[in-house]
Curated annotation (Swiss-Prot):
It comes from Buchnera aphidicola subsp. Schizaphis graminum (strain Sg). It comes from the Bacteria. CDD domains: ATP-synt_F1_alpha_C, ATP-synt_F1_alpha_N, F1-ATPase_alpha_CD. Disulfide bonds: none annotated. Pfam families: ATP-synt_ab, ATP-synt_ab_C, ATP-synt_ab_N. The record marks S373 as: Required for activity. The keyword Ribonucleoprotein does not apply. Produces ATP from ADP in the presence of a proton gradient across the membrane. The alpha chain is a regulatory subunit. F-type ATPases have 2 components, CF(1) - the catalytic core - and CF(0) - the membrane proton channel. CF(1) has five subunits: alpha(3), beta(3), gamma(1), delta(1), epsilon(1). CF(0) has three main subunits: a(1), b(2) and c(9-12). The alpha and beta chains form an alternating ring which encloses part of the gamma chain. CF(1) is attached to CF(0) by a central stalk formed by the gamma and epsilon chains, while a peripheral stalk is formed by the delta and b chains. Its EC number is 7.1.2.2. One of its GO terms (cellular component) is plasma membrane. The lineage of its organism: Bacteria, Pseudomonadati, Pseudomonadota, Gammaproteobacteria, Enterobacterales. Belongs to the ATPase alpha/beta chains family. This is ATP synthase subunit alpha. Keywords: ATP synthesis, ATP-binding, Cell membrane, CF(1), Hydrogen ion transport, Ion transport, Membrane, Nucleotide-binding, Translocase, Transport.
């Protein structure tokens, strides 16, 4: 078959018409230095602060310093294979992490990837790790409690849903134990929890996960891990990732709880990154924006209005308010709460629970210092029975500590003073509680009623704990309906008062 010149030219024209040119442009730059996980990039333009930068092998860095000619970025993960001269690209995206119900019961890293060996997580929703806190109009007042299960805290330092309550104290004073017990106590009401481990040993994190699993609380918890062996960039990122995961529940009309363990190590990781980025150091070598580091994180914990939930879900969920309650943990050195990071976080949060080494070592656990522990908004959220019956506990303890200090110098004490000292000792003993043994509202209510109405007068200090154990067993065996009724609505009235008196008298006569 022979083709003439006309047919050949026609074929060429058709091919030219069908030819498509793919014109794809990239915002590309070159790495000019690599230093302890910090890369300097030359040649990138129009970079956003916090933008993801694509590195070889599908790894990412985040732009934190934007200078005239160069970009300072922190690598999210290992950086040994990254060399000078490597080409990198802008993505035009701010870092996002996967969120949703599918993450409950899983252990993930700061980027949201599973690290528990249970396979991949099916999710289709991503949220940015950095988000604006809800405005004043979008918020609701706090009027519902988060029960920690600890008598000392639910009575004296109550926590409301949407509150930020700091747990502060020296190492080995029970800070993590308190937070873990609070998570365990939420399993009864299926309240989603997020536990963020920052800069901790892997052995410690494994123990925490094991305890959550043993008490059936892991299925309701997302564990976000940035251990001490991981890059400072991932330790810096972890709390923001965990917060985004918690906000998913808040913005869908649910209540959620998040624990940051701990923000002292978070501040140290940020200090390391800032110094490597050549930012000017300030007090204790922390950068000038270390307050903003924690304020923008903790302000995202809030109780949001029905309108906010409706707007975020585009009308799919209506008539529901949501909340995210934050329990940040700060470790102090020798009880110094006036250090830079502790004072910052105290001023940001809505109160603090101060755990003291001396109390812990003397066997008072939880080692709550009632004098400087405070909840600024939680009292409005207390259940009626706890609010009514625990009002005199803090006063009694304050008087006891004052008299105990005075009695060391006085040789003889009058009858009234002796009585107050013994009552204070009994209250101190009553507030002691073992780990992983959170108490329900009805159990706390009954014990506070006994203390408030002088039913402890004929019981010695040594027998308080045994008495508590026996009367609670008796209450569940013979007055189960009463205990369940109180757990359900948290009310206290004359009928319940009469039933409590009857229960106590029957127990003492048995």
């Amino acid at each position: 078959m022979q083709l003439n010149s006309t047919e050949i030219s026609q074929l060429i024209k058709e091919r030219i018409a069908q030819f498509e040119v793919f014109n794809q442009s990239y915002n590309e730059g070159t790495i000019i230095s690599v230093n302890d996980g910090i890369i300097k990039i030359y040649g990138l333009s129009d970079v956003m602060l916090g933008e993801m930068i694509l590195l070889p092998d599908n790894e990412y860095a985040i732009a934190l310093n934007i200078e005239r000619d160069t970009i300072g970025a922190v690598v999210m993960g290992p950086y040994i294979h990254i060399t000078e001269g490597t080409k990198v690209r802008c993505t035009g995206k701010i870092l996002e992490v996967p969120v949703g119900v599918a993450l409950l019961g899983r252990i993930v890293n700061a980027l949201g990837f599973p690290i528990d060996g249970k396979g991949s997580i099916e999710h289709d929703i991503y949220l940015p790790v950095e988000a604006d806190a809800p405005g004043v109009i979008e918020r609701e007042s706090i009027n519902e409690p988060i029960q920690t299960g600890y008598k000392a805290i639910d009575a004296m330092v109550p926590i409301g849903r949407g509150q930020r309550e700091l747990i502060i104290g020296d190492r080995q004073t029970g800070k993590t134990a308190l937070a873990i017990d609070t998570i365990i106590n939420q399993k009864k009401i299926n309240l989603p929890c997020v536990y963020v481990a920052i800069g901790q040993k892997l052995s410690t994190i494994i123990n925490v996960v094991k305890k959550l699993d043993e008490h059936d609380a892991l299925l309701n918890t997302i564990v976000v891990v940035a251990s001490a062996s991981e890059a400072a960039s991932l330790q810096y990122l972890a709390p923001y990732s965990g917060c985004a995961m918690g906000e998913y529940f808040r913005d869908r009309g649910k209540d959620a709880l998040i624990v940051y363990d701990d923000l002292s190590k978070h501040a140290v990781a940020y200090r390391q990154i800032s110094l490597l980025l050549r930012r000017p150091p300030g007090r204790e070598a922390f950068p000038g924006d270390v307050f903003y580091l924690h304020s923008r994180l903790l302000e995202r914990a809030s109780r949001v209005s029905k309108e906010h939930v409706k707007n975020v879900t585009k009308g799919k969920i209506t008539g529901k308010t949501g909340s995210l309650t934050a329990l940040p943990i700060i470790e102090t050195q020798s009880g110094d709460v006036s250090a830079f990071v502790p004072t910052n976080v105290i001023s940001i949060t809505d109160g603090q629970i101060f755990l003291e080494s001396n109390l812990f070592n003397s066997g008072i656990r939880p080692a709550v210092n009632a004098g400087i522990s405070v909840s600024r908004v939680g009292s409005a959220a207390q259940t009626k029975i706890i609010k009514k019956l625990s009002s005199g506990i803090r006063t009694a303890l304050a008087q006891y500590h004052e008299l105990a200090a005075f009695s060391q110098f006085a040789s003889d004490l009058d009858q009234t003073t002796r009585k107050q000292l013994i009552y204070g000792q009994k209250i101190t003993e009553l507030l002691k509680q073992k780990q992983y043994r959170p108490m329900s509202i009805s159990e706390q209510g009954l014990m506070f009623f006994i203390a408030e109405n002088n039913f402890l007068d004929d019981i010695s200090v040594e027998n308080i704990i045994q008495f508590e154990k026996e009367i609670l067993t008796y209450a569940y065996n013979y007055h189960l309906d009463l205990m369940e009724e109180i757990n359900k609505d948290g009310n206290f009235n004359d009928i319940i008062k009469k039933k409590f008196i009857e229960l106590i008298n029957n127990f003492k006569n048995s």
